[in-house]
């Protein structure tokens, strides 16, 4: 959406000596909106490891499932600019925060084609169940880590 600040939300998990991406999605505002927040009508769409969007996009309303944006552009297969750079930057920054296991990162690409970190979410990284298991292939590992920390 050209009227809103659209952001890439990555959720990363720090394992012992590496950082992995749990989920990645593009958050987009709707026509005329300046923000991409789902709570005010925005939508989100999964980003595959290749950096391409995977339809559909979802909104906050349970019936809010979209194959295309308000301008008629189909989401499926659209390439997110500088996606690999965004992933690399999130992983690199996460390694500097050794006591934080899961972080939600919000990035955008500015009009100069530069990756910009908007914020990181330490307390509530966001859970986007509609695009698949929130903890992905690391579910068992993360749950075991939580169980061990309770002892």
Per-range role (PLM):
Residues 1-57:
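Phosphate-binding site of ATP-dependent enzymes
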Residues 2-5, 85, 102:
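Short, well-structured alpha-helical interface segments that form or flank functional binding sites
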Residues 59, 63:
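Acidic, metal/cofactor-coordinating or nucleic-acid-engaging core segments within structured domains
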Residues 65-91, 95-100, 109-151:
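C-terminal active-site "lid" helix and adjoining low-complexity regulatory extension at the edge
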